[in-house]
Structure formats: structure tokens, C-alpha cells
């Protein structure tokens, strides 16, 4: 039990650390996304510097990383706490990938995948919240921040287990922390909208 749990946590980190956005930038444009735009390897920076198609593929792959880490833990019949730790390991791998000098993405897509795997109605509700905000504002970071803030509330009101509620708070804080510079620009009114160049 302990060994299988530890192996799943390690696998979760390795899954999360797969640098999909970085590889898209290198292979398709010959650029290092860590040196472009926001410096993030996530789908939004791919959208701004590589293109819509690659950004969609990166988004789906990043969602898959988070979902797979959780679903593997579930498939082995491990308890809720191991499941959420596997998901957090994937988030940590995405944010701090060992292959890229610990500089990765902002955990939004991978976090979405994680919660689709843990409690898909909550994951879909967060996605709906994200889409509603982005349709009104056309600001990805604002949509991410609102969805992150809403996540623990949605998990709590859905009757999620104590492990699920706890990890929703932790994941929300991780996403907000990764968006701290975006929040500063949002407050200053300088955050770019979709289609505009700039940091995000």
C-alpha cells in the first residue's frame, strides 16, 4: 500500500512535468516559451506565441496529465487522500518540471484535469465558470482566477469528501499564487485580452 502510493505520487509528478507547451514552442517555432511572453509553458502562452491549434493540443494534453494521475490512483483502489496527493504531484510537476529548471506552467489546465478525475461535476462547473468569465472579459487570467476562487466553494457545496475539499483549497491557492503577477496587472488595468500581445 505504502509503496504503491509512493510510486503513484512519483508517477504523478512525472506526468505533470511533461513539458507539452515547451515542446510545442521548440518543435513548431524554434522558441523557448520560458523566454517569451509570460515565460509560462502553459496553453495561454502557446496561444500567444505559437498559435491556436498548438494551444488547443497543449491544453488537452495538460488536462490529460492531471486527470490521468488521479484516475490511476482510483484504478488501484487507493483512498481519497492518495488520489488528491497524486493530483497535487501532477500539479507540482506542471508548475516545477525538473526537465526545465523548475519553470513550467500555471496549473490551470492540469488542475482542471485533476478535478475532472476527482469529481467531474465540480470540474465541469469550474470549466463553465471559466468559460462564462472569458466570454465576457476575454481575459484568460481573470477567468482562471475566478474559477480558482470558485473551486473550493463548488467542492464544498457538492458534498465532496474532506480530502477533496482540502485539496480544492490547496489547488486554488497554487493557481492564485502562480497568477500573482497577473492579479497585479488586473488591478492596474493592464492585463492583455485574447488577441493582444503581452504577458499573461
Curated annotation (Swiss-Prot):
Which key words are in the record? Answer: Cell inner membrane, Cell membrane, Lipid biosynthesis, Lipid metabolism, Membrane, Phospholipid biosynthesis, Phospholipid metabolism, Transferase, Transmembrane, Transmembrane helix
Membrane spanning stretches: 1-21, 53-73, 81-101, 114-134, 139-159
Alphabetical list of Pfam families matching this protein:
G3P_acyltransf
GO annotations of cellular component type: plasma membrane
Bilayer topology reads:
Multi-pass membrane protein
Q: Which reaction does it catalyse?
A: an acyl phosphate + sn-glycerol 3-phosphate = a 1-acyl-sn-glycero-3-phosphate + phosphate
What GO MF annotations does this protein's record show? Answer: acyl-phosphate glycerol-3-phosphate acyltransferase activity
Its subcellular locations are: Cell inner membrane
Matching SMART domains: G3P_acyltransf
Query: NCBIfam families attached here?
Result: glycerol-3-phosphate 1-O-acyltransferase PlsY
What exactly does this protein do?
A: Catalyzes the transfer of an acyl group from acyl-phosphate (acyl-PO(4)) to glycerol-3-phosphate (G3P) to form lysophosphatidic acid (LPA). This enzyme utilizes acyl-phosphate as fatty acyl donor, but not acyl-CoA or acyl-ACP.
Relate the assembly described in the record.
Answer: Probably interacts with PlsX.
Q: This chain belongs to which protein, by name?
A: Glycerol-3-phosphate acyltransferase
Q: Which organism is it from?
A: Synechococcus sp. (strain CC9902)
Amino acid at each position: 500500500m505504502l509503496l504503491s502510493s509512493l510510486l503513484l505520487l512519483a508517477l504523478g509528478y512525472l506526468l505533470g512535468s511533461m513539458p507539452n507547451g515547451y515542446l510545442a514552442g521548440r518543435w513548431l517555432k524554434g522558441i523557448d516559451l520560458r523566454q517569451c511572453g509570460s515565460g509560462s509553458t502553459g496553453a495561454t502562452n502557446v496561444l500567444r506565441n505559437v498559435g491556436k491549434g498548438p494551444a488547443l493540443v497543449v491544453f488537452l494534453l495538460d488536462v490529460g496529465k492531471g486527470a490521468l494521475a488521479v484516475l490511476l490512483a482510483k484504478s488501484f483502489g487507493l483512498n481519497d487522500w492518495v488520489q488528491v496527493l497524486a493530483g497535487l504531484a501532477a500539479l507540482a510537476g506542471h508548475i516545477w518540471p525538473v526537465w526545465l529548471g523548475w519553470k513550467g506552467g500555471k496549473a490551470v489546465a492540469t488542475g482542471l484535469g485533476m478535478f475532472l478525475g476527482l469529481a467531474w461535476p465540480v470540474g465541469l462547473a469550474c470549466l463553465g465558470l471559466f468559460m462564462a468569465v472569458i466570454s465576457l472579459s476575454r481575459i484568460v487570467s481573470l477567468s482562471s482566477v475566478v474559477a480558482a476562487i470558485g473551486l473550493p466553494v463548488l467542492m464544498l457545496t457538492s458534498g465532496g469528501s474532506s480530502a477533496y475539499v482540502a485539496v480544492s483549497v490547496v489547488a486554488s491557492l497554487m493557481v492564485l499564487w502562480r497568477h500573482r503577477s497577473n492579479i497585479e496587472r488586473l488591478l492596474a488595468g493592464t492585463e492583455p485580452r485574447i488577441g493582444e500581445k503581452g504577458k499573461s
